[in-house]
Amino acid sequence: MAETEALSKLREDFRMQNKSVFILGASGETGRVLLKEILEQGLFSKVTLIGRRKLTFDEEAYKNVNQEVVDFEKLDDYASAFQGHDVGFCCLGTTRGKAGAEGFVRVDRDYVLKSAELAKAGGCKHFNLLSSKGADKSSNFLYLQVKGEVEAKVEELKFDRYSVFRPGVLLCDRQESRPGEWLVRKFFGSLPDSWASGHSVPVVTVVRAMLNNVVRPRDKQMELLENKAIHDLGKAHGSLKP
């Protein structure tokens, strides 16, 4: 009960600050759930989506969502889209299978880093990056290497606060079909919770961890949340719609 009350108080205090937020990658699974949860919790006075195309929503709750359409190959021409946001969430990402090796690096490293640079220049104070369990710039695996590289590069920008989330396998029902992922999700879903939670995490838990974290005051400039910490924070009492 005390934890629930404390979290509710943190949220209320955060709302009173009338902060603005942008989301990169709102068309993806994590970004889509993040947007939904942000609107349900009402944490921000202004919500902006930055993406390569305008998204369509039928629900009334989305009517005040702002959208900035940009060309990620010419992001400098769209610097204004990144101006005036207090908080940023970056959920950009693709796969080597979908985009090829060069395309994957371009999206997951180059687009993310350039977006972070423009966000910093535009006044963003708290940048949140969705990365991956095992991210390591020295890894022999391209995926983990790129994730580790971009983590380090964004840290060099010296945001007032920089939060990196390293979830395991994301458990969700993708709108986009990715061969093999369905089997992986079924595999983890059949395992004991104690084992599966160390290597996987539901998308909604990641999103709630992000939002529970953003309302908590922190002295550290950089914070790294691994899969277990994401589970713990995402399942904190009061993490549902207020």
Swiss-Prot record:
<keyword id="KW-1015">Disulfide bond</keyword>
<dbReference type="GO" id="GO:0005635">
    <property type="term" value="C:nuclear envelope"/>
</dbReference>
<feature type="binding site">
    <location>
        <position position="178"/>
    </location>
    <ligand>
        <name>NADPH</name>
    </ligand>
</feature>
<feature type="binding site">
    <location>
        <position position="92"/>
    </location>
    <ligand>
        <name>NADPH</name>
    </ligand>
</feature>
<keyword id="KW-0945">Host-virus interaction</keyword>
<feature type="active site">
    <location>
        <position position="147"/>
    </location>
</feature>
<protein>
    <recommendedName>
        <fullName>Protein HTATIP2</fullName>
    </recommendedName>
</protein>
<feature type="binding site">
    <location>
        <position position="29"/>
    </location>
    <ligand>
        <name>NADPH</name>
    </ligand>
</feature>
<feature type="binding site">
    <location>
        <position position="93"/>
    </location>
    <ligand>
        <name>NADPH</name>
    </ligand>
</feature>
<dbReference type="GO" id="GO:0046777">
    <property type="term" value="P:protein autophosphorylation"/>
</dbReference>
<feature type="region of interest" description="Required for interaction with elongation factor EEF1A1">
    <location>
        <begin position="2"/>
        <end position="25"/>
    </location>
</feature>
<dbReference type="GO" id="GO:0043068">
    <property type="term" value="P:positive regulation of programmed cell death"/>
</dbReference>
<dbReference type="InterPro" id="IPR016040">
    <property type="entry name" value="NAD(P)-bd_dom"/>
</dbReference>
<feature type="active site" description="Proton acceptor">
    <location>
        <position position="143"/>
    </location>
</feature>
<dbReference type="GO" id="GO:0051170">
    <property type="term" value="P:import into nucleus"/>
</dbReference>
<dbReference type="InterPro" id="IPR036291">
    <property type="entry name" value="NAD(P)-bd_dom_sf"/>
</dbReference>
<feature type="binding site">
    <location>
        <position position="30"/>
    </location>
    <ligand>
        <name>NADPH</name>
    </ligand>
</feature>
<dbReference type="GO" id="GO:0005829">
    <property type="term" value="C:cytosol"/>
</dbReference>
<feature type="binding site">
    <location>
        <position position="170"/>
    </location>
    <ligand>
        <name>NADPH</name>
    </ligand>
</feature>
<feature type="binding site">
    <location>
        <position position="147"/>
    </location>
    <ligand>
        <name>NADPH</name>
    </ligand>
</feature>
<dbReference type="GO" id="GO:0016491">
    <property type="term" value="F:oxidoreductase activity"/>
</dbReference>
<dbReference type="GO" id="GO:0006915">
    <property type="term" value="P:apoptotic process"/>
</dbReference>
<comment type="subunit">
    <text>Monomer. Forms homodimers during oxidative stress. Interacts (via N-terminus) with elongation factor EEF1A1 (via middle-region); the interaction is direct and competes with EEF1A1 binding to guanyl-nucleotide exchange factor EEF1B2, thereby inhibiting GDP for GTP exchange and reactivation of EEF1A1. Interacts with nuclear transport receptors XPO4, IPO5/RANBP5, IPO7, IPO9 and KPNB1 as well as GCN1L1/GCN1 and LRPPRC probably through their HEAT repeats. Binds NCOA5/CIA.</text>
</comment>
<comment type="subunit">
    <text>(Microbial infection) Interacts with HIV-1 Tat (via activation domain).</text>
</comment>
<keyword id="KW-0810">Translation regulation</keyword>
<feature type="binding site">
    <location>
        <position position="143"/>
    </location>
    <ligand>
        <name>NADPH</name>
    </ligand>
</feature>
<feature type="binding site">
    <location>
        <position position="27"/>
    </location>
    <ligand>
        <name>NADPH</name>
    </ligand>
</feature>
<dbReference type="GO" id="GO:0001525">
    <property type="term" value="P:angiogenesis"/>
</dbReference>
<keyword id="KW-0963">Cytoplasm</keyword>
<dbReference type="Pfam" id="PF13460">
    <property type="entry name" value="NAD_binding_10"/>
</dbReference>
<dbReference type="GO" id="GO:0030154">
    <property type="term" value="P:cell differentiation"/>
</dbReference>
<feature type="binding site">
    <location>
        <position position="28"/>
    </location>
    <ligand>
        <name>NADPH</name>
    </ligand>
</feature>
<dbReference type="GO" id="GO:0045944">
    <property type="term" value="P:positive regulation of transcription by RNA polymerase II"/>
</dbReference>
<keyword id="KW-0521">NADP</keyword>
<dbReference type="GO" id="GO:0005737">
    <property type="term" value="C:cytoplasm"/>
</dbReference>
<keyword id="KW-0043">Tumor suppressor</keyword>
<feature type="binding site">
    <location>
        <position position="52"/>
    </location>
    <ligand>
        <name>NADPH</name>
    </ligand>
</feature>
<keyword id="KW-0007">Acetylation</keyword>
<comment type="function">
    <text>Represses translation by preventing reactivation of elongation factor eEF1A. May also inhibit nuclear import by competing with nuclear import substrates for binding to a subset of nuclear transport receptors. Has additionally been proposed to act as a redox sensor involved in cellular oxidative stress surveillance.</text>
</comment>
<dbReference type="GO" id="GO:0005739">
    <property type="term" value="C:mitochondrion"/>
</dbReference>
<dbReference type="GO" id="GO:0004674">
    <property type="term" value="F:protein serine/threonine kinase activity"/>
</dbReference>
<feature type="modified residue" description="N-acetylalanine">
    <location>
        <position position="2"/>
    </location>
</feature>
